[in-house]
């Protein structure tokens, strides 16, 4: 008997495009003006908008709907709060555009950024029309995600001095709008869009996957899609649905259940998928809204070897469908790693250093920026060093500050179970195998700005500066390998699109007729770290 273990994968196979002379050559099983591939937030929005324009819409979804939107925090980035929506928006729009221009670093045009900023208030109002609810209550501290009852916050680097824009706004408004909900808001966010999709009369086909596109050979127009559909009423179809619900609840099954169980689930899902039947559907235009490639183990091994894969279903099938008809992919090696060290809100008062003991990043920046600096420039290894005063304040916030359990519990464990304690800088340097002189220099360079003598060399704002006055120090391992501190990742690369109309473009820069991209399949540009 062979001891070789067979790899079981649920990655969607995407076939070569089916080229035909005309639509009449295909025996279509269904037809619609618009077929949307993927029923997450972007797919739902595309379907609703198409219905409002009078088009017949068919939404095809591999699972039951929701995609990454359900697993998200349900946060919408927009340049307005309720109090400013009725005021002239030019000053706020210009400030938002300037900030985003700094963040995205040229990945999209200035015109697109300006349009996004200008339309963000309209987009927020549109979401409210679909049933989503927003509010303006804010937490009193910097956080990666606000607690229940708090629905507006600084969700990026807006308050970091290096990202500010004093010529336009002395203090930018918060732009992270969390959908009002109990618990993480992603489910409520998608529930509103799902309900609106159905209310608008869009048809849906769930537990079905698009395996290839159909193209008119001479014109290059995408005519339709070939879909694998699980048979209705089959026990395997019901099992597939239940297993997908299990995966959705756990967000990333390999982190929540034993590996043996995870493998069994993947095998069961693969067996269910093999019972599907193939049917072609004719379309007038086809928006791809299938989710990202962070779950595609082959793609991750190629572009980011050593990184773990993400949520189930994020296999890049929408991207590969676009590539099958000549769509161009860009920045597939651009993976955003989120190392949030707030809350506790006082942690950024500490020092983040590399394994040589050198400070390399402003500790108060957005988690994606810190994660980028750590992963791309420091080999995924870093330490957060705090003193007794910061640790005491952080512990109080974890216990009594109303934080989420996923924020407070890891922080407490890291401070009191994982952290390495040093009686002095020299003692800590010895335990961390660092040069004591190098580490001491970091504290000297941090203490002088804290006393107001000089500016912080990495641009930390005055309220986040902290003078270390001696006593015990605690080094917290915030590396990617730290099992008590999971590192979330998101793929940012994707299909290149015409920024004016969303059409997927080919290698020559021309629109591919009939094919559009929305959501994650097109190149993601928020945020783009520098």
From Swiss-Prot:
Enzyme Commission number, as recorded: 1.3.99.5
Recorded topology in the membrane: Single-pass membrane protein
pH dependence: Optimum pH is 8.
Keywords, sorted A to Z: FAD, Flavoprotein, Lipid metabolism, Membrane, Oxidoreductase, Steroid metabolism, Transmembrane, Transmembrane helix
Enzyme class: oxidoreductase
Residues given in the record as FAD binding sites: 33-62
Catalytic activity, reaction form: a 3-oxo-5alpha-steroid + A = a 3-oxo-Delta(4)-steroid + AH2; 5alpha-androstan-3,17-dione + A = androst-4-ene-3,17-dione + AH2; 5alpha-androst-1-ene-3,17-dione + A = androsta-1,4-diene-3,17-dione + AH2
Thermal dependence of function as given in the entry: Optimum temperature is 40 degrees Celsius.
Modulation of this protein's activity: Inhibition occurs with substrate concentrations above 25 uM.
Single annotated GO MF: 3-oxosteroid 1-dehydrogenase activity
Pfam families: FAD_binding_2 (PF00890)
Cofactors: FAD
Transmembrane segments: 395-415
GO cellular component, one term: membrane
Compartments, record wording: Membrane
GO biological process, one term: steroid catabolic process
Role of this protein: Involved in the degradation of steroids having an A:B ring fusion in a trans configuration. Catalyzes the elimination of hydrogens located at positions 4 and 5 and the introduction of double bonds into ring A.
PANTHER family referenced in this protein's UniProt entry, alphabetically: 3-OXOSTEROID 1-DEHYDROGENASE, FUMARATE REDUCTASE
Name the UniProt record assigns to this protein: 3-oxo-5-alpha-steroid 4-dehydrogenase
Organism of derivation: Comamonas testosteroni
């Amino acid at each position: 008997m062979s001891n070789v273990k067979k790899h079981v994968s649920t990655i969607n196979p995407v076939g070569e495009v089916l080229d035909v002379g005309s639509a009449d050559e295909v025996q279509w099983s269904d037809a619609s003006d618009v077929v949307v591939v993927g029923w997450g937030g972007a797919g739902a929005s595309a379907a609703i908008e198409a219905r409002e324009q009078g088009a017949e819409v068919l939404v095809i979804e591999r699972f039951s709907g929701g995609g990454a939107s359900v697993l998200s925090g349900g946060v919408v980035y927009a340049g307005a709060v309720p109090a400013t929506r009725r005021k002239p928006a030019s000053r706020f729009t210009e400030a938002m555009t300037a900030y985003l221009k700094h963040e995205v670093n040229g990945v999209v045009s200035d015109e697109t950024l300006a349009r996004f900023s200008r339309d963000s208030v309209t987009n927020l109002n549109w979401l409210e029309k679909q049933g989503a609810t927003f509010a303006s209550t804010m937490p009193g501290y910097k956080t990666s995600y606000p607690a229940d009852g708090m629905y507006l916050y600084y969700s990026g680097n807006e308050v970091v001095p290096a990202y500010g824009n004093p010529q336009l706004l002395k203090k930018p408004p918060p732009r992270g709008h969390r959908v009002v909900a109990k618990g993480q808001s992603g489910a409520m966010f998608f529930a509103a869009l799902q309900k609106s999709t159905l209310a608008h009369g869009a048809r849906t086909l769930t537990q079905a996957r698009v395996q290839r596109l159909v193209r008119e050979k001479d014109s290059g127009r995408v005519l339709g899609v070939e879909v694998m559909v699980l048979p209705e009423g089959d026990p395997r179809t019901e099992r597939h649905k239940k297993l997908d619900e299990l995966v959705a609840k756990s967000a990333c099954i390999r982190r929540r259940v034993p590996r043996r169980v995870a493998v069994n689930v993947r095998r069961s899902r693969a067996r269910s998928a093999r019972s599907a039947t193939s049917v072609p559907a004719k379309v007038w235009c086809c928006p791809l809204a299938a989710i990202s490639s962070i779950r595609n183990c082959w793609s991750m091994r190629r572009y980011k070897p050593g990184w773990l894969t993400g949520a189930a279903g994020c296999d890049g099938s929408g991207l590969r469908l676009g590539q099958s008809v000549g769509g161009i992919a860009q920045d597939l090696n651009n993976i955003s790693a989120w190392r949030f060290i707030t809350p506790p809100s006082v942690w950024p008062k500490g020092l983040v250093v590399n394994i040589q003991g050198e400070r390399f990043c402003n500790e108060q920046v957005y988690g994606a920026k810190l994660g980028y600096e750590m992963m791309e420039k420091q080999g995924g290894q870093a330490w957060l060093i705090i003193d007794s005063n910061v640790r005491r304040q952080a512990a109080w916030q974890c216990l009594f500050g109303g934080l989420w359990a996923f924020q407070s519990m890891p922080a407490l464990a890291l401070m009191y179970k994982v952290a390495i304690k040093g009686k002095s800088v020299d003692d800590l340097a010895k335990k961390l195998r660092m040069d004591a002189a190098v580490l001491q220099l970091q504290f000297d360079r941090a203490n002088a700005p804290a006393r107001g003598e000089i500016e912080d060399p990495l641009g930390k704002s005055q309220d986040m500066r902290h003078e270390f006055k001696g006593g015990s120090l605690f080094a917290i391992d915030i590396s990617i390998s730290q099992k008590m501190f999971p590192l979330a990742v998101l793929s940012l690369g994707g299909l290149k699109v015409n920024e004016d109309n969303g059409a997927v473009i080919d290698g020559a820069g021309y629109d591919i007729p009939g094919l559009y991209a929305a959501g994650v399949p097109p190149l993601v540009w928020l945020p783009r770290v520098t």
